[in-house]
Amino acid sequence: MATNPKREVLNRKRALFYFLPAAGYAALIFALSSMALDMEELGPVLAFDKLLHLAEYCILGYLLMRAFATSGVPALAASPMAATILAGSVYGLSDEIHQAFVPGRVASLTDLLFDAAGVSLAALTYPYVRYRLGPVRALENRIEAEVSRR
């Protein structure tokens, strides 16, 4: 079966447009969790630690859901919610394991649960958020159309 080269280029550009923000944000999470911490200096921040995990992974979940829902990959597009929750939770697990090897950091099951909750919250609310943010969706469509023309 012959494939259309223009369509392949378009699919690659589309994949970059949607997956690059998710990959970049995952790299940011990794970089932040690589920083050694002094627990005494972070006393006040630790009170909000779980909310920070929830928010951090909610953003990742939204970016993953956006990428999977528009990927054009049948397995991902068929169930982007499940793919988002699975991928985000596995990434959270890998991040917690990574933190076990960083001075001043510890791996925490509670943190992992808040990571998974954040990703799940994003996946479950994504359709509503996309509906409510119609102007954002319209802007994304214009940008994607411009990228496709190049």
Predicted regions and their residues:
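Interfacial helix-loop-helix junctions of multi-pass membrane proteins
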Residues: 40-46, 92-116
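Small-polar-interrupted transmembrane alpha-helices in polytopic inner-membrane proteins
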Residues: 22-33, 81-100
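Membrane-interfacial, low-structure loops and terminal tails that flank and connect transmembrane helices
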Residues: 1-12, 134-150
